[in-house]
Amino acid sequence: MRPDHMNFCCLCAAILSSTAVLFGQDPLGETALLTKNPNHVVCTFFEDCTMESLFPALCAHASQDDPLYVLGNSYCWFVSKLHITDPKEALFKEKGDLSIQNFRFLSFTDCSSKESSPSIIHQKNGQLSLRNNGSMSFCRNHAEGSGGAISADAFSLQHNYLFTAFEENSSKGNGGAIQAQTFSLSRNVSPISFARNRADLNGGAICCSNLICSGNVNPLFFTGNSATNGGAICCISDLNTSEKGSLSLACNQETLFASNSAKEKGGAIYAKHMVLRYNGPVSFINNSAKIGGAIAIQSGGSLSILAGEGSVLFQNNSQRTSDQGLVRNAIYLEKDAILSSLEARNGDILFFDPIVQESSSKESPLPSSLQASVTSPTPATASPLVIQTSANRSVIFSSERLSEEEKTPDNLTSQLQQPIELKSGRLVLKDRAVLSAPSLSQDPQALLIMEAGTSLKTSSDLKLATLSIPLHSLDTEKSVTIHAPNLSIQKIFLSNSGDENFYENVELLSKEQNNIPLLTLSKEQSHLHLPDGNLSSHFGYQGDWTFSWKDSDEGHSLIANWTPKNYVPHPERQSTLVANTLWNTYSDMQAVQSMINTIAHGGAYLFGTWGSAVSNLFYAHDSSGKPIDNWHHRSLGYLFGISTHSLDDHSFCLAAGQLLGKSSDSFITSTETTSYIATVQAQLATPLMKISAQACYNESIHELKTKYRSFSKEGFGSWHSVAVSGEVCASIPIVSNGSGLFSSFSIFSKLQGFSGTQDGFEESSGEIRSFSASSFRNISLPMGITFEKKSQKTRNYYYFLGAYIQDLKRDVESGPVVLLKNAVSWDAPMANLDSRAYMFRLTNQRALHRLQTLLNVSYVLRGQSHSYSLDLGTTYRF
């Protein structure tokens, strides 16, 4: 053995020892060192190790009473194909603590033990801990007794940081992977997976009397485990004592129980006392058992659920019955077991599978006859189920994840044998769900929401403070049904949340509707107060609701009648961006004209070819102040052309180019534009005046995309537009002595004109709308001053322009927008931006022999809008 290894191991042993007195050391080959101290034994690894049998000396020390610490020092320990026939061949700790820690990778794979032997790792009368390890893998291990991989009186799995997996372990007894009296699965950084473990008796993955699973900051997965009771976890007690059989899942990041199964009770979990609180999302999906599809609570036990940092979901869990086959079930409460509370704070509690509570008067559970116990007697002293939620959270019972064939009474009915107290927040029944309980009380600040088609049944008198019926659930056949000996409801109202589109229902609301059923009562009950017909403001169809009672031999029905008036389009439909596209074209053509005017200035040359990058940013907001009327436009492209500039300041320019643009409003609509541009410019100069003229032609193809938030489909459409613009300019140059900041300045005035039209079109997908053709014409009068500076020494040319622009005449024509599915139309006019504007432009040109570079920056400020343009170009002069 290397001396430095020996010294390091001695140091570790000294640190761990309170007395630092060494009784002896036992090398384990070249891999590890056993150090005997007065109070404990330390096994220290100093290299990676792979083995098919454990160190005999390590197993011998494990059988002694002193605590044993196995330290990995960030090395790997791989144990595989270990077949134990004698406890002396395993980590068998009858007394004292056993700790395995600080391994980079710890693996026990394909190991097995006979019935007379314990698990691969076994501890009794002490504490077993696996902590501070990187990755851990316990796979395909088997025990003829209990605990396929690990068995212990007290076991803690803590502070592990990479990945932990217990997969495909099995046992003939309890705990396919782990069997313990108490188990702490806490404060791990690593994701933890229990997958495809199997136990012949209880707890496919874990079987223990008390389990605390808390503070794990990465997901926990329990998938594909199986057992007789508790497909994934079993925490029950043979003795009827409250301190036994408890399971606590608290403050974990995310937890998934999926595809676990039990032959008898608890597809995912079978426990006596269970608390689920302050976790991230917790999901129970596709679990199955004979009793308790996801969770079964032992007789005399309790269950409490608090959705703290994420929702709790029960979906597609089922229990097997002899006469009904598979029946959906989330939770089964055995005789005298209670569901103490459902509390939704920062997440919802969603039951897409029903709850069943066994009647105290029954001798054994009969899950195939759920309806027979609807009105079974309940002692007056039964503990109530307390339901509380925050303002925007709900406890939801729903069958919306069921197919029509699966919507049978057993799959729809949640049967409770204890009173319900709705203290605060929202209790929601959706999509034909049925809730049955001995009684239900509702505090004034709480809200009961029942969709049409759902039912509430109580065996005692029912007094409700507020009942809300969601508008989106209404149709001409289904209604809310309430069964109670006597019923009183202080307030009934129709609700429509902001993200629902009930008033967009063309089939139901575009015409007058009579006899829409809202609420059905038994004939023994009396009429209730009619709902309030006054509606809050909304988009879509506008109209009036009226209500009345209709009596029949079957009972009383509350009937709603609808009288339509008009239609107010949803803001997501009201896009003005299409009409305002002509403003974008106008701004782009101004940027092109600015670039062409720049080419007309500068040094003289006989003939030149040039090219330039052109960019334009245009921001606008209408005076309405609505986000839908605010938009911005960006374009980038190029121009290339030929030009000449004489010594007498005569000039001529011919150019063509392309711009690619994208526009979007402050809402959900965007357009992409491809523009093709051609322009010509000429200037004549005299000693007293310069006269120039310019004409520009633009043809564009536009594509509209609408990413609806309130409607399901994305809208798409395309259209074509054509625009022409021109200007005539007269300027009077004044030459200074050339010694100042500028060598000359000019006073100028222009007459500018713009005319643009765009075709009407229909969208090809989404909420299909038809947009009318529109046009925009504008005549303006810019006036201002320019300053020039030519430097012969540096061959630089500077040019500054400042102008005031007054629009003389503006003419806008635009038609309505039509929603084709109901032929409703509305106006989406073009924005009326200010008729006054200010323009500033700064240009620099520099001659480099035959090349001439160009930089042009301009800014236009107008009431409710402003734009920037930047051009970079070069000219080759012949």
UniProtKB/Swiss-Prot annotation:
Residues 372-381 have a biased composition (Polar residues). Residues 602-878 form the Autotransporter domain. Residues 1-24 form the signal peptide. It is a peripheral membrane protein. PROSITE patterns: AUTOTRANSPORTER (PS51208). Belongs to the PMP outer membrane protein family. This is Probable outer membrane protein PmpI.
